Amino acid sequence: FHVPDDRPCINPGRCPLVPDATCTFVCKAADNDFGYECQHVWTFEGQRVGCYA
């Protein structure tokens, strides 16, 4: 399997707690039918941030 490269999120919505955060679509290898899993990761000034309290 080829794990997709990180890329900007498509239609990420917004990050309520950190409006200026950047969304990246991050994939990593996983034990499932696709061989990988992906998630939206929000970062601001190099730090991962949570978008919801």
UniProtKB/Swiss-Prot annotation:
Monomer. Interacts (via C-terminus) with human CPA4. It comes from Nerita versicolor (Four-tooth nerite). It comes from the Eukaryota. Coiled coil: none annotated. The keyword Disulfide bond applies. This is Metallocarboxypeptidase inhibitor. InterPro entries: MCP_Inhibitor_Domain_sf. Metallocarboxypeptidase inhibitor. Has an inhibitory effect on bovine CPA1 and CPB2, human CPA1, CPA2, CPA4, CPB1 and CPB2, and porcine CPB1. Does not inhibit D.melanogaster svr (carboxypeptidase D). Shows no activity against serine proteases subtilisin or bovine trypsin, cysteine protease papain, and aspartyl protease porcine pepsin. GO terms for molecular function: metal ion binding; metalloendopeptidase inhibitor activity. Disulfide bonds join C9-C23, C15-C51, C27-C38. GO terms for biological process: negative regulation of endopeptidase activity. Keywords: Disulfide bond, Metal-binding, Metalloenzyme inhibitor, Metalloprotease inhibitor, Protease inhibitor, Zinc. Zn(2+) binds at A53.
